[in-house]
From Swiss-Prot:
<keyword id="KW-0677">Repeat</keyword>
<keyword id="KW-0479">Metal-binding</keyword>
<feature type="zinc finger region" description="C2H2-type 14">
    <location>
        <begin position="537"/>
        <end position="559"/>
    </location>
</feature>
<comment type="similarity">
    <text>Belongs to the krueppel C2H2-type zinc-finger protein family.</text>
</comment>
<feature type="zinc finger region" description="C2H2-type 15">
    <location>
        <begin position="565"/>
        <end position="587"/>
    </location>
</feature>
<comment type="function">
    <text>May be involved in transcriptional regulation.</text>
</comment>
<dbReference type="InterPro" id="IPR013087">
    <property type="entry name" value="Znf_C2H2_type"/>
</dbReference>
<dbReference type="GO" id="GO:0006357">
    <property type="term" value="P:regulation of transcription by RNA polymerase II"/>
</dbReference>
<feature type="zinc finger region" description="C2H2-type 19">
    <location>
        <begin position="677"/>
        <end position="699"/>
    </location>
</feature>
<protein>
    <recommendedName>
        <fullName>Zinc finger protein 99</fullName>
    </recommendedName>
</protein>
<feature type="zinc finger region" description="C2H2-type 21">
    <location>
        <begin position="733"/>
        <end position="755"/>
    </location>
</feature>
<dbReference type="GO" id="GO:0005634">
    <property type="term" value="C:nucleus"/>
</dbReference>
<feature type="zinc finger region" description="C2H2-type 12">
    <location>
        <begin position="481"/>
        <end position="503"/>
    </location>
</feature>
<feature type="zinc finger region" description="C2H2-type 9">
    <location>
        <begin position="397"/>
        <end position="419"/>
    </location>
</feature>
<feature type="zinc finger region" description="C2H2-type 8; degenerate">
    <location>
        <begin position="369"/>
        <end position="391"/>
    </location>
</feature>
<feature type="zinc finger region" description="C2H2-type 2; degenerate">
    <location>
        <begin position="201"/>
        <end position="223"/>
    </location>
</feature>
<keyword id="KW-0863">Zinc-finger</keyword>
Amino acid sequence: MGSLTFWDVTIEFALEEWQCLDMAQQNLYRNVMLENYRNLVFLGIAVSKLDLITCLKQGKEPWNMKRHEMVTKPPVISSHFTQDFWPDQSIKDSFQEIILRTYARCGHKNLRLRKDCESVNEGKMHEEAYNKLNQCWTTTQGKIFQCNKYVKVFHKYSNSNRYKIRHTKKKTFKCMKCSKSFFMLSHLIQHKRIHTRENIYKCEERGKAFKWFSTLIKHKIIHTEDKPYKYKKCGKAFNISSMFTKCKIIHTGKKPCKCEECGKVFNNSSTLMKHKIIHTGKKPYKCEECGKAFKQSSHLTRHKAIHTGEKPYKCEECGKAFNHFSALRKHQIIHTGKKPYKCEECGKAFSQSSTLRKHEIIHTEEKPYKYEECGKAFSNLSALRKHEIIHTGQKPYKCEECGKAFKWSSKLTVHKVIHTAEKPCKCEECGKAFKRFSALRKHKIIHTGKQPYKCEECSKAFSNFSALRKHEIIHTGEKPYKCEECGKAFKWSSKLTVHKVIHMEEKPCKCEECGKAFKHFSALRKHKIIHTGKKPYKCEECGKAFNNSSTLMKHKIIHTGKKPYKCEECGKAFKQSSHLTRHKAIHTGEKPYKCEECGKAFNHFSALRKHQIIHTGKKPYKCEECGKAFSQSSTLRKHEIIHTGEKPYKCEECGKAFKWSSHLTRHKVIHTEEKPYKCEECGKAFNHFSALRKHKIIHTGKKPYKCEECGKAFSQSSTLRKHEIIHTGEKPYKCEECGKAFKWSSKLTVHKVIHTAEKPCKCEECGKAFKHFSALRKHKIIHTGKKPYKCEECGKAFNNSSTLRKHEIIHTGEKSYKCEECGKAFQWSSKLTLHKVIHMERNPANVKNVAKLLNISQPLENMR
């Protein structure tokens, strides 16, 4: 590597560029250049103090503003003019001779200029010689370029040629690695270091290496511990003048650069200039590929990478690739786990300064970006731009496959993957494939078992940062996203977007198979799986298969038994946060969603929607086994289990199995005998809150559910449904052993025990055994001698509520069970069953069936 010169760390401006700078920017340029110069001298590196340093020290401009032909220094052949700009050696030599001959007229015949300065002393000699030369320049500047030939030569090969290259918009220097083009060779050389990862400038103190010399200079100041820039007000000292300036602004509160348009103030003029573009609305930088325009050229350059799809910068840690090196650098901080940027207000730390800046706005509550249409204000410009799209309703990015349109190109890119069945990103651990590398990366964390992101509030750990962020909202309870239509608020904008569809009646996504329409494409995609019959997501624990991964994940929680979401009101715990949210509505008693048809109110909009189907009379979900139709798919799914007979949820205490996990949960309470839910009216306690709620209706005396057949009213809809079966006479639940049919599955379950001699439930008090735990529980009351169930009519007390209910019928005299054969009525269904035997006896063919029906072996004569 050749000897380092001052020009290696020099910032250059063309004449026209210098004229564009304001006073503050020119002063900043002077400070930076002089600081670089002082640093080089301090390090003992030979520096030739050329005219630029002389001008800057004297406070003069580095450009002669009177004559546009003038350049930073007289046209001396210095190291600054590289071979790139002198293609012909003879022209270079002759040009030097012309200049020297011209200066000889002033008496400086022996003036000699060296190409490079090899020491500091030579640099001083060169400076003295140059000062003399500069004197000649001022006296003869009107004569030097009299000859047009020499003016043309100068303009062709001078430093100003670099500026001309920029205006031609030609980028002649191309990187062979990533095809990026540059105006100047020096920029290409700097860029190449990114690919080579070459750190040629090494610190002798610690051995740390840097790509650029300017970064090394800044780094070396750390080792000197010299902090010459001290602010008297707070006593704080700094290595760099720019840090001192920032500190000063904090204390004084002065921001010298103010926008005349909106009054916003900035620390420096360059930021102000960028800001001013917002008000002009101009977007001069246009993409030739898609026509999208940008306010800054850097934004256009970034955008172009989208069309090429090229991501040359790859992370060695996780393999993720990026369009830009800056994005890779930001990403790499994640792997270090460092968060050097701390908020002084709340102490929260961040990995990037930009994220800290965004966060700090929260404490100031400043929202300078206001939308004129609706008056809504935002803390940052990007949020304002996103909001603007809501009002315009524009969706310029359209999917060619299904016609779905999007507001942002990124959303379209994500959507396109849906149409391709390709999953190129495969997990080496379990073989699972993904469409995107980001999804694979998230999945891989599962195998490591690591959960590095911990909640400070409840110590719950997460495998990714986004999951932690979502979780933290639970503790704050904040719901910033509000629906303008119904006022409902949400924690996340995505939930609000999904909710808004409810208010629209449009269902653009239609199933070609069955014609069913959906509001979201995602819902249609899930629906289509039903037609294929595929269930690719299988539970490793129990072998149960599912249509989608989300259902499988929910199912897996059953096996863990974890219930992390707890109600603060009653202590009840839930497996999912959504279930807790639903539960909370019970305590508030609020029912904002009302049915216009019948006036019934609901806690959730989904419950209202399900209810409204009842009024339409539609039952689109049909059972393929028995043809029975249902208004909801969930009810159909529950019904289908009847035919399969599957009971995957088993009680570890008594071995009883259930079709649904909710039933198992309810059952488990029996073994604990805990009854935390107490009625304030009568003191009766219950295992479940739902049982207490049902009980409370008794005290109100209300019976809103009426039977259309006989006019009998009930306090609960479930009781009405059970009652209606009496009139239909339907008995869908049949015993495979003896053929006996039942109206309810629970009755069939109880009946099945008859065929088995097994009695697993034994009384510890007297040794009596029972087939059902419920029978044992009833029996145990006998030993206590308690009779908590009392008849209000006659005062008679009973061990259990069912016996009390049977007794109460005596006082009412009601006989709801009627024989279709002879019209005779009975108070209990069991009596009606016995009575029916009389009619069946007349037909000898039915005798065997009657015996089976009643599960008896004795002659029927004995029963009359």
